[in-house]
Amino acid sequence: MSSNSPTNLADRYAFLQAELARLEHAYYVLDNPLLPDIEYDRLYRELLDIEAAHPQWVTSESLSQRVGGTALKEFDSVTHAVPMLSLNNAFEDSELIAFDRRCREALHVEHVAYAGELKFDGLAISLRYENGTLVTAATRGDGASGEDVTANIKTIRAIPLKLTGKNIPEILEVRGEVFMYLKDFEKMNRQAAELGEKEFANPRNAAAGSLRQLDSKITAKRPLSFFAYGLGALEPQSWLPKTHEELLNAYVELGLPVCSERRVLHSVEEILAFYNEIGAKRDSLPYDIDGVVYKVNSFAEQAKLGFVSRAPRFALAHKYPAQEALTTVLGIDVQVGRTGAITPVARLAPVEVGGVTVTNATLHNEDEVKRKDVRIGDTVSVRRAGDVIPEVVSVIKERRPSDAKEFVMPSRCPVCDSHIERLADEAVARCSGGLFCGAQRKQALIHFAHRRALDIEGLGEKIVDQLVDQNLVRTPADLYRLGFTALANLERMGEKSADNLIQAINQSRNTTLARFIFALGIRHVGETTAKDLANHYQSMHALMDASVEELLTVKDVGPVVADSITSFMQEAHNREVIEQLLASGMQLSVEEKIISAAVFGKTFVLTGTFPTMTRDEAKDLLEKAGAKVAGSVSKKTDYVVAGTDAGSKLAKAEELGVPVIDEEEMLNLLK
């Protein structure tokens, strides 16, 4: 460089940006270093020196921005322009064969080409590029919206801040997976051990934990990587290639990292061969996977197949069998689930299963413990079912010690000391503590606030967790004693949100008796039974005092439901909570049915999206008119009400010859 004049310096700065981006792509994406590290570092320091002298030149695309910035207090929410759907899973070859058959039959073709690729065990991410520049990155979240992790994503050197190539779309949302290479994970854990810091259990946890750091400077120190494999929003649509494989090739041209372990497959035989080939070398791959994914290769055929529920019809995840290991049972405890289920859990000598240290494994229920004959002191085979939930598979009885102890199910709940009961025809024992039991409290509150129950908008799982953990709420009745200050002081709860939640709680006092009964969370009492009970008893106190014999006279209430209701009502603390709720100003109305002769006694099934109402609203209208709304289509179904994007229920109705009507025709029947 002959001069330090601003013009020449600006040219040099532009050259360094482009050159360093090229070198990073070669190093982190192509695994083909073009310069020694010392030379790269020299160029990078020169870039930093120029930016220090001319900070006005720095943009979000500068490689210096990968080091991380100011720590955040919380992540903002990002709504996905195109939902990030999950995939249906297959564990058996027969499920894969059925998937291929469904695709061929739906497309009316003899053969379908599939794009086969790996299912990475990391964290799904969406990257939004506008005119080639990375502007937003978000986690999958619930599929509809996720967390804004843009600052953290920019620290991952495998992800380009600026796309390369000539054919760059105006808007491109790249879907992919953030993960850690095994060698990078092991090196990071070794360094953590040397410093006396906590080690991560596995690469997936390390990747997820690193990406969700509020301080991006911490993320910048973590060896995260990325592979692109999917597409979200796109403008213009004319940019879209014809096939998934061509899309991935286009990604490579744009400078995005794409896994090379992929193949276009033309038959079930080729699919199974690909699955077995990857499975054979799974342990030697440089990263963790838990299966392979098949996607119909043609985008036109994908569009024809569409979606069902929260998953595409054109794709399937083929999981590998769970991995197993042997260890010793040190003890057997019981855990209380959110619905009161008592689950025996084996405490194990620590053992590595599928790269995870396992110290506990589920034994499911008392019958399973007896069937497998699991005893304290036994050597057992432990498996991570679905590579997630550890379970005891079998006992190695040849190694059983003479002092091995049998498991005895406790008679009292270890959390609240309520009686543990087990109905004769059920495998699961349950705590009878109901709302009084701390283990069940959070789920009871979430159910109480559900939109089909008391419909308390804004009272979600995260708020409930804080209310219970801070001992602000023990029962649903405590919700109606909450003050503005207590709510406003909760994490992620400002004054406006606190005010809105208090209003929602107050509004919930005016509800129906049926919703109130359903909200109590009595086992076996769903919405329909709650409505039948409300119509029969007309008041809460009448239901509370009902005997089993009286309950059996209610429509569709059998011995199991009657026993469940009386057991719930006989618990003194449950009655106390109900009385507190009633004393808080609850106004419980009994819905009057407006009988329609055209639908009375008829069975309806709802599917798809309706033009003027939700399916829940349609269900309420039909039930008030005396109809029954079922969840699946059968020969006993009288009508299927279908909206747009109707799924498999519509196909089933056509197969069985069940009449299909739209929303307008349903409303005409109700007149």
Swiss-Prot record:
Gene3D superfamilies: 5' to 3' exonuclease, C-terminal subdomain (1.10.150.20), 6.20.10.30, BRCT domain (3.40.50.10190), DNA ligase/mRNA capping enzyme (3.30.470.30), Helix hairpin bin (1.10.287.610), Nucleic acid-binding proteins (2.40.50.140). Its EC number is 6.5.1.2. PROSITE patterns: BRCT, DNA_LIGASE_N1, DNA_LIGASE_N2. Its cofactor is Mg(2+); Mn(2+). It comes from the Bacteria. GO terms for biological process: DNA repair; DNA replication. It catalyses: NAD(+) + (deoxyribonucleotide)n-3'-hydroxyl + 5'-phospho-(deoxyribonucleotide)m = (deoxyribonucleotide)n+m + AMP + beta-nicotinamide D-nucleotide. PANTHER family: CHROMOSOME TRANSMISSION FIDELITY FACTOR 18, DNA LIGASE. Belongs to the NAD-dependent DNA ligase family. LigA subfamily. This is DNA ligase. The lineage of its organism: Bacteria, Pseudomonadati, Pseudomonadota, Betaproteobacteria, Burkholderiales.
